[in-house]
Each structure stands twice: as structure tokens, then as C-alpha cells.
Swiss-Prot record:
Residues 678-690 have a biased composition (Basic and acidic residues). It comes from Pongo abelii. Keywords: Mitochondrion, Repeat, tRNA processing. The gene is PTCD1. Gene3D superfamilies: Tetratricopeptide repeat domain (1.25.40.10). This is Pentatricopeptide repeat-containing protein 1, mitochondrial.
């Protein structure tokens, strides 16, 4: 009987299994069917509780469940699902162990920043206009960079070319953008483009490395730029990459602006060692390196200048301008060392020329000339002369008779005692007829009776050593070089203030047919204002207007330097308001400096009131000036007696403290802020017609 019951049970299992497959929902663990369908869990027939019952009872329970209420089945299934989901969760409720997650404010800020970037990051739109080529983008970026629109060029390349059109860039695309970054010193972006270029397996060219060294030279942060340039140079040396002369010039420019003259000479020797022919442009970068030494740079520049002339190179106009910059900014160094190196005749050609090889006559004339120039340039001898110590330069003392030729000896005896030496003084700027004229630009032009330098401290003194205004221009004429407006502006800065040479500068403009600019006149106005000649500075304004020039803020700033009286300074501010020109912080700084020098605190308070009325932001220089003016004297004793000066400074201190609370501060902008591309936030709201604008098609 038991076997019969088992047979009936298994005979009903096959249609039951088919029925299960037809009504089983794959997404949930319960029956899915109509009202007549079974609504019970899949695991119910196979549970452990049902297997313990007898077969008869199990059959009765199954038949009873088939005829039961569907709502009861649903509640049972839901309860069993909840129990299944809460399985293993009771330990968290009754356990005494607590779990902690590491979290910091920086971590939350980082996660918040990532979410914000994901939300604000614009989705790149696919390009729907006419497709362009990488060469077309190269021409467009080159045109924008030439117009000074570096931001537009970067946006055109990164957004339209790479993201929208999804074109594969060429080496020329990256090189053009790196060159544009090099003009403005955008170091970070230039090396970022260089790294992207290497990731795309594009081979950099000589122009790429030239642009990279140039961006290091123009960077506002010299230390980091020097490290980047040295690292790039080491990478090129590891790859045995041969640089051309243009790239070496960019490297030499970087060494001149970011390092010192010694590194310039190292690069210079490498140029000679590689067989390149040096030009006057090479010596121009060496002159830049000389200018970096503010103490002895003028003497270095004269030695480099003489070497350039001894090699037969004609100096260019830029070389003359750099020599004037050295005369304006750099000193002569030790006068005794300068006298030994610049006044004594030296056989530089013999020292710098190595023995000639016997195989040179077999070569061509062009190769012979190039090798002769490279052979004459013995940089080690020049380096020894440049960095000569005082003890090495002087050596054992020599009697004056040994230094002065016999023909000039009687003339010296009639003028001075034999034990004294003739000295070159700053009076050489306006020499009398009987006084010696000196021009150190030509070694043979130094008279033998001039054996040492006198006091050479001002730019006018250093200009006198190269012949003065007329002697300098005559040397330019010998080398067939005409002065430009930059040359005349530099001459206006180095000539002696109030001298006849300064009045000749306006005549030189017409003589050489040079068109004057505002910088030239601003230089003349500033020099007269520094002398206290405010009326003479104002007299230049009609001359400026006659040449069709309009004064700018720099012109008013130069006029403010000479406003030592309150009447002049306040009148200048009134005239600027009538001209609808708002003074900036530099003009107020010049007026504050003039008031502090006169210790006129009433004048100073009036300047601060006008600055407050115009809401001009305060910079660091103005704060430093006002803090100095608000200090008490070191020997101040309040109880010693009544002091009118101290009563005024107390009133200024009280007003200055209240003035600081209401004045806005001027923020110094980042040098690269204006070159950074901004994300396109309104990509979805822009019209579709904008895709076919000027930069969209050919």
C-alpha cells in the first residue's frame, strides 16, 4: 500500500513541475499567476519542515494550502522575505563592538569637490559643422597667437579640435601653442602641452625645444623655470639630441635671465664645441647675462663687447641697446680691477687665437672662415679675465714710468707730479678742450696717460666712459646702425639730468627721423620731476600734444613725483577729475611719498580723503608708506614738552586707523590668470547656429 501511495505521489510531480515552470517569476521568489494560480514560495515544497511529516499529512497540507486564501499566502511570503533580509543583522543590535570609519574635513572637501566637478563639468558637444584638418587648426592658432589671443587659441585647440571634432593633432599644433605660451612665460601650460605631446607618441622638433627653453626664460618665477630647463637639458643630453643654433640661443637666453654669467659661458663653450658659428645675436644673449650682475655687470659688458669686435662681428642695434641697459642698471665693480682690465693694452687676439692646423689650407674658403672664427673664440681665456680676482688683477705694483710711454711723459710732468696718476672723473661728460676724451668701446682709443678710474657711480658717469651721448651715437654710425626710439629712451634715462645733452634728445628725434612715443616723453617728465622742476615737466605737455600724443596714467604719475607742495598735488588731482581720469594707486603712492618726505601730515590726510572718495584700492606699497609715516621718532618723549609735530602725527594716526577700516584692498592678480581657459558652462543653452561661426569653417 505504501508503494501505491508513492507511485501516486511521483505520478503527480511531473505536471506539477511543468506548472511551476510556467508560473514562476524570475524576478521574485514566489509564484506569479492569476487568481487560480498558486501563490506560495518556491522553496515551500522543498522545506525541511515538510519533509518531517508523514506522507498523508503532507498531502492534506498541500491540498489545504491550494484552497486557502490568497491574502494569507501573500502575508506569509512577505513575512518570510523580511526574515530572509534580516538574517545576520541581529549581531549588530546586540553586539558591544562598535565600528568607526576614518573621516576628515579634507576628505569631505575632496568628495564635495568631485561631486561639484561632475555637476559643473560640461559635456562636450559633437561637431556638426564642416570638418577641418589639423593643419587648418595650426594656421588658426598661429594667427590668434600673433594677434595676442592666447586664450582663444588654447580654447580652439582643446575644446573644438580635440573634444568636439576629435581630431588627432600633429606636432606643429603643439609647437605653435607652446611657442605662444613662451611669449608670455606660461610655463605650466607649456610643459603640460609637451607632456600631452609625448603621450600621443608625437616626436618633438627643434622648434618645440626652442619654445620650451624660451618659456623658461620668460617665466616670472626664475627658480622653478631654471629647474625645468635643466631637467629638459639633461633629458636631451641623455638622448644625445643635437641642438641647432636657434635652440642654443634660447638656452643661452634662459641662462642669462634665470641663472648667471658663468652658466652663460658654459652654454657658450658648448656652442663652440659643437661647431656652430657664433653671431652678434649670440653675443646679445651674453650681454643679457652680464646685466644680471648689478654690481660688476657694466665691466663684464665692456669685456664681452671688445671680444665681439676682436672677432670681426658688427654689433647690432639691439647690442647697443643692451649696452645702455648695462650702463643704466649695473656698476663697474672694483675700480682697480676695472683699470687693469680695461685701460691696460692687452694682446687679446694673441691670447684667444690657438695655433692653426696644417690641414686648414685644404679646406674650402667658407669652412676656413667658420673654423677660424671658432678657433679665435677661446672662451676659457675670456672667462679668466671676466672673473679675475682683485689680487690677481693687480699683481706687483709697477712704477708710473713703466706704464706711461716716453712720448707722453713730458706732458704728464707739466700737469702733475710724477708720483700721481691721472684719474678719469665724471667730468668727462662735459670735457673742456684740453681734457681727455675716453671711449672704452674701442680699446685703442684709450689715451696712455689715463691709468685708473675715478669715482664712477651714476649712469651718467658710465655713459661718459663710452664717449657720452655724441660719442655713443658716433660709434653706432661707424657700424651703420641708426638709433630707434628705444635707443633714445635709454639715452634719456642715462644722460645727466639738466645737462645740455638732455636738451639735445628732442632734436635727435627729428635728425634721425624717429617717431616719438609716450614712453620717451614720460621718461623726460620723470627726470624733471625728480629734480623738483615741476614747471619744466609741465612744459613738456604741449610738446607731447603737438606730436599727437595723449597723456596716460604714467604721465600723471611722473608729474605727481614733483608735487612736493600741497597746492601742486591737490591741483593735479583736480585737473585729473576735470579730464575724467581716475587716479590709480601708483599716483597716490607718488603723492604720499612726496608728503612723507616733507613731514606734512595735513597734506597726507587730504590725499587719503581724496583716495577714499574715489574708492581706489590700497596696495602693499601704500600701506608700507603709511605705516612708516605713522611711526613715532626713536627719541620720542611725550612728557618732555609740547611738540607741534607730535600733535599732528597723533591726528594722522587717529584718521589713518579709521581710514583703514573702510578702504578696499587691491589683490595682486596671478600672472597666468588671464591666460587660463574657462570652462564652457552654457554648452547646452548655446544656439546651434553658433557652430558655424568664423572659426567653424574654412
Amino acid at each position: 500500500m505504501d508503494f501505491v501511495r508513492l507511485a501516486r505521489l511521483f505520478s503527480r510531480a511531473r505536471p506539477m513541475g511543468l506548472f511551476i515552470l510556467q508560473h514562476l517569476d524570475p524576478c521574485r521568489a514566489r509564484w506569479a499567476g492569476g487568481r487560480e494560480g498558486l501563490m506560495r514560495p518556491v522553496w515551500a515544497p522543498f522545506g525541511s519542515s515538510s519533509s518531517q511529516l508523514p506522507l498523508g499529512q503532507e498531502r492534506q497540507e498541500n491540498t489545504g494550502s491550494l484552497g486557502s486564501d490568497p491574502s494569507h499566502s501573500n502575508s506569509t511570503a512577505t513575512q518570510e522575505e523580511d526574515e530572509e533580509e534580516s538574517f545576520g543583522a541581529l549581531s549588530d543590535k546586540y553586539s558591544s563592538r562598535r565600528l568607526f570609519r576614518k573621516s576628515t574635513a579634507q576628505f569631505h572637501n575632496l568628495r564635495f569637490g568631485e561631486r561639484r566637478d561632475e555637476q559643473t563639468k560640461p559635456e562636450p558637444k559633437l561637431w556638426r559643422g564642416q570638418r577641418n584638418t589639423p593643419y587648418w587648426y595650426f594656421l588658426q592658432c598661429k594667427r590668434l597667437i600673433k594677434e595676442g589671443k592666447l586664450v582663444e587659441a588654447l580654447d580652439l585647440f582643446e575644446r573644438q579640435m580635440l573634444k568636439e571634432e576629435r581630431l588627432q593633432p600633429m606636432e606643429s599644433n603643439y609647437t605653435a601653442l607652446i611657442g605662444g605660451c613662451g611669449r608670455v612665460g606660461y610655463l605650466k601650460k607649456a610643459f603640460s602641452l609637451y607632456n600631452q605631446m609625448k603621450k600621443r607618441d608625437l616626436e618633438p622638433s627643434d622648434a618645440t625645444y626652442t619654445a620650451l627653453f624660451n618659456v623658461c626664460a620668460e617665466s616670472p618665477w626664475k627658480d622653478s623655470a631654471l629647474q625645468s630647463a635643466l631637467k629638459l637639458r639633461q633629458q636631451l643630453q641623455a638622448k644625445n639630441f643635437e641642438l641647432n643654433l636657434k635652440t642654443y640661443h634660447a638656452l643661452l637666453k634662459m641662462a642669462a635671465k634665470c641663472a648667471d654669467l658663468r652658466m652663460c659661458l658654459d652654454v657658450f663653450k658648448e656652442i663652440i664645441h659643437k661647431g656652430h658659428v657664433v653671431t652678434e645675436e649670440t653675443f646679445s644673449f651674453l650681454l643679457m647675462g652680464c646685466i644680471q650682475d648689478k654690481k660688476t655687470g657694466f665691466r663684464y659688458a665692456l669685456q664681452v663687447w671688445r671680444l665681439m669686435l676682436s672677432l670681426g662681428l658688427q654689433p647690432s642695434r639691439d647690442s647697443y641697446n643692451l649696452l645702455l641697459v648695462a650702463a643704466r642698471d649695473c656698476g663697474l665693480g672694483d675700480p682697480q680691477v676695472a683699470s687693469e682690465l680695461l685701460l691696460k693694452p692687452r694682446e687679446e687676439a694673441t691670447v684667444l687665437q690657438p695655433p692653426v692646423s696644417r690641414q686648414q689650407p685644404r679646406r674650402t674658403a667658407q669652412a676656413k672662415a667658420g673654423n677660424l672664427m671658432s678657433a679665435m673664440l677661446h672662451v676659457e681665456a675670456l672667462e679668466r679675465q671676466l672673473f679675475l680676482e682683485t689680487s690677481q688683477a693687480l699683481g706687483p705694483p709697477e712704477p708710473p714710468e713703466a706704464r706711461v710711454p716716453s712720448k707722453a711723459q713730458p706732458e704728464v710732468d707739466t700737469k702733475a707730479e710724477p708720483s700721481h696718476t691721472a684719474a678719469l672723473t665724471p667730468v668727462a661728460l662735459k670735457p673742456p678742450p684740453l681734457e681727455l676724451e675716453v671711449n672704452l668701446l674701442t680699446p685703442g682709443a684709450v689715451p696712455p696717460t689715463v691709468v685708473s678710474f675715478g669715482t664712477v657711480t651714476t649712469p651718467a658717469d658710465r655713459l661718459a666712459l663710452v664717449g657720452g651721448l655724441e660719442g655713443f651715437l658716433s660709434k653706432m654710425a661707424e657700424h651703420r646702425q641708426q638709433p630707434d626710439i628705444r635707443t633714445l629712451t635709454l639715452l634719456a634715462e642715462v644722460v645727466e639730468s639738466g645737462s645740455p645733452a638732455e636738451s639735445l634728445l628732442l632734436a635727435l628725434l627729428d635728425e634721425h627721423q624717429v617717431e616719438a612715443d609716450l614712453t620717451f616723453f614720460n621718461t623726460l617728465v620723470r627726470k624733471k620731476s625728480k629734480l623738483g622742476d615741476l614747471e619744466g615737466a609741465k612744459a613738456l605737455l604741449p610738446v607731447l600734444a603737438k606730436r599727437g600724443l595723449v597723456p596716460n596714467l604714467q604721465t600723471f604719475c611722473n608729474l605727481a613725483i614733483g608735487c612736493h607742495r600741497p597746492k601742486d598735488g591737490l591741483q593735479l588731482l583736480t585737473d585729473m577729475k576735470k579730464s575724467q581720469v581716475t587716479p590709480n594707486s601708483h599716483i597716490y603712492s607718488a603723492l604720499i611719498n612726496a608728503a612723507v618726505r616733507k613731514l606734512n601730515y595735513t597734506y597726507l590726510i587730504n590725499i587719503l580723503k581724496d583716495m577714499k572718495q574715489n574708492r581706489v584700492p590700497v596696495n602693499e606699497v601704500v600701506i608700507r608708506q603709511l605705516e612708516f609715516a605713522a611711526q613715532y621718532p626713536p627719541t620720542f618723549d611725550r612728557y618732555q614738552g609740547k611738540n607741534t609735530y607730535l600733535e599732528k602725527i597723533d591726528g594722522f594716526r587717529a584718521y589713518y586707523k579709521q581710514w583703514l577700516t573702510v578702504m578696499p584692498a587691491e589683490e595682486t592678480p596671478h600672472p597666468w590668470q588671464k591666460f587660463r581657459t574657462k570652462p564652457q558652462e552654457d554648452q547646452d543653452t548655446r544656439k546651434e547656429a553658433d557652430d558655424g561661426c568664423a572659426l567653424g569653417g574654412r
